[in-house]
């Protein structure tokens, strides 16, 4: 690692010795990683290696699965997100999520963005709400395409537009971290390029952690990359270093397509 690793204020998320089980099956094994603020971190690895499971540990989405048990530290601002008494709703406001397939609410474009800030009492006046919706849609690169049809259903948009609407929905509450679980896997190449450009812009204000199976995408968008294999994090480094000179044979084989 090359980035001021000992400077705590650069950290957004600190993970130490994280283990997770689905019943008797251990899905994550002793994961330790520092995720830096205002960067894009890509999680790569074969299907079933633990990438998405790890991602969901960062906002406790795994808590929704009855058979899950977790040990280890996931820390934000010095607070363990798994600590007893942690407000999960408040945590998920700070750690937004964008899923693999666009999933807009069955509401208008406007309401898709306005709903969460209103539920969190972030706005009271209609004018403030309008301003917040416009800001989120602008930040998601969608405003000019929807400003004249804000009260049409979010589901009326194209797939790529729906995914940007979901990003606008996530950033409307101004989270610290945005989790993206293969956010472009269901999109066409043009929409994919738009989302990738957006990720580069959004990292100025947010920390982004993304799961991807696309090595080229990881190389294009990520500042740091972590390679997972069979529940273990095999290697974590600056993306340029990882892709030009990986330190492990497993990472090299996966990145170069020789895996398996």
Curated annotation (Swiss-Prot):
One Pfam family here: ABC_tran
Keyword hit for DNA damage: no
Biological-process GO terms, alphabetical: phosphate ion transmembrane transport
Encoding gene, per UniProt annotation: pstB1
Membrane topology classification: Peripheral membrane protein
Quaternary context: The complex is composed of two ATP-binding proteins (PstB), two transmembrane proteins (PstC and PstA) and a solute-binding protein (PstS).
Family label: Belongs to the ABC transporter superfamily. Phosphate importer (TC 3.A.1.7) family.
Role according to the record: Part of the ABC transporter complex PstSACB involved in phosphate import. Responsible for energy coupling to the transport system.
Cellular localisation: Cell inner membrane
Keywords: ATP-binding, Cell inner membrane, Cell membrane, Membrane, Nucleotide-binding, Phosphate transport, Translocase, Transport
InterPro entries named in the record: AAA+_ATPase (IPR003593), ABC_transporter-like_ATP-bd (IPR003439), ABC_transporter-like_CS (IPR017871), P-loop_NTPase (IPR027417), PstB-like (IPR005670)
The keyword Oxidoreductase is annotated on this UniProt entry: no
Catalytic activity: phosphate(out) + ATP + H2O = ADP + 2 phosphate(in) + H(+)
EC nos: 7.3.2.1
UniProt xrefs under PANTHER family: ABC TRANSPORTER I FAMILY MEMBER 17
Major location (coarse): membrane
Top-rank EC class of the record's enzyme: translocase
Residues in ABC transporter domain copies: 13-255
Residues that, per the record, bind ATP: 45-52
Protein name as annotated: Phosphate import ATP-binding protein PstB 1
SUPFAM superfamilies with a match to the protein in the record: P-loop containing nucleoside triphosphate hydrolases
Top-level taxon of the source organism: Bacteria
GO molecular function: ATP binding; ATP hydrolysis activity; ATPase-coupled phosphate ion transmembrane transporter activity
GO CC annotation: plasma membrane
PROSITE patterns named in the record: ABC_TRANSPORTER_1, ABC_TRANSPORTER_2, PSTB
NCBIfam families hit by this protein: 3a0107s01c2 (TIGR00972)
């Amino acid at each position: 690692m090359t980035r001021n690793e000992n400077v705590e204020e650069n950290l957004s998320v600190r993970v130490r010795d994280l283990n997770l089980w689905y019943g008797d099956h251990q899905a994550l094994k002793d994961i330790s990683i520092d995720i830096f603020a205002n960067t894009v971190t890509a999680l790569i690895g074969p299907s079933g290696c633990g990438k998405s499971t790890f991602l969901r540990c960062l906002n406790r989405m795994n808590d929704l699965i009855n058979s899950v048990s977790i040990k280890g530290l996931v820390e934000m601002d010095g607070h363990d997100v798994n600590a007893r008494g942690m407000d999960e709703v408040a945590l998920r406001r700070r750690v937004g999520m964008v899923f693999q397939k666009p999933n807009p609410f069955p509401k208008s474009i406007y309401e898709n963005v306005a709903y969460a800030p209103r539920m969190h009492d972030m706005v009271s006046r209609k004018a403030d709400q309008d301003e917040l919706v416009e800001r989120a849609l602008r930040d998601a690169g969608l405003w000019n395409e929807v400003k004249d049809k804000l009260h049409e259903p979010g589901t009326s948009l194209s797939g790529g537009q729906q995914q940007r609407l979901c990003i606008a929905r996530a950033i409307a509450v101004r989270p610290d971290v945005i989790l993206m679980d293969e956010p472009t896997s269901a999109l066409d190449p043009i929409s994919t390029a738009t989302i990738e450009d957006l990720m580069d812009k959004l990292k100025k204000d947010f920390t982004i952690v993304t799961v991807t199976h696309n090595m080229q995408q990881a190389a294009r968008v990520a500042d740091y990359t972590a390679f997972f294999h069979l529940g273990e994090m095999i290697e974590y480094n600056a993306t340029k270093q990882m892709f030009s000179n990986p330190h492990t044979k497993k990472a090299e084989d996966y990145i170069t397509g020789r895996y398996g």
